[in-house]
Design a protein with these regions (language model features):
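Short glycine- and hydrophobic/aromatic-rich loop-to-beta-strand nucleating segment
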Residues: 46-47, 103
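Radical SAM enzyme [4Fe-4S]-AdoMet core and its adjacent flexible, acidic
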Residues: 1-41, 47-51, 55, 59-70, ...
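Flexible mid-to-C-terminal extensions adjoining Fe-S/redox cofactors in radical SAM and related proteins
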Residues: 59-172
């Protein structure tokens, strides 16, 4: 996992390359400005793993349903997915859009209250043994991201758009 400083540098470099090169680059962690926050939980994206478990995101290894037992419509309307979507965006600062690494307390609460099972061996360790380190990471990156977000908001031509508006121009 990148350090908070490396993550910020990645965000800056992606913005530079998008502005200067004819290339499509996508970064789940840092592209909240392009998508108005996290796209997971069925808002614009979800993941079905090889066993058929319907996960909010490829990085969220917990589920309530399996496509072998329920339809996608039923899975996407489960309490897990409804709760996930109800909390989006997880922050007004769209540089901090992930419920796992930017707001781990929210990811933990969603997983432990609304998921029926973990989808990978050891996945629960993210919310137990690894949680203190992830929480510390989130706080350290949060300081960097807050400063970057305040700077972004100062730019008159780059205000956040209401949900549903098309994003055009600089994105970083």
């Amino acid at each position: 996992m990148t350090t908070p400083e490396q993550r910020n540098r990645t965000r800056e470099r992606y913005a530079y390359f998008r502005a200067t090169k004819p290339i499509l680059m996508v970064d789940f962690w840092n592209d909240g400005c392009l998508t108005q926050g996290c796209i997971a939980g069925g808002r614009k994206y979800f993941h079905v793993n090889a066993r058929g478990d319907v996960e909010p995101c490829v990085f969220c290894h917990f589920a309530s349903d399996n496509v072998k037992e329920k339809s996608l419509v039923e899975a996407l309307n489960s309490p897990l997915f409804r709760e996930f979507r109800s909390r989006q965006p997880f922050s007004e600062n769209l540089f901090r859009n992930c419920p796992l690494i930017d707001h781990p307390e929210q990811g933990k609460e969603i997983a432990l209250k609304f998921a029926r099972y973990f989808t990978h061996e050891g996945a629960e360790e993210f919310f137990t043994e690894l949680f203190p380190a992830i929480d510390a990471y989130s706080k350290a990156y949060g300081e960097i991201a807050e400063a970057a977000w305040k700077e972004r908001m100062k730019r008159q031509d780059d205000k956040p758009l209401p949900a549903g508006k098309k994003v055009v121009g600089k994105h970083g």
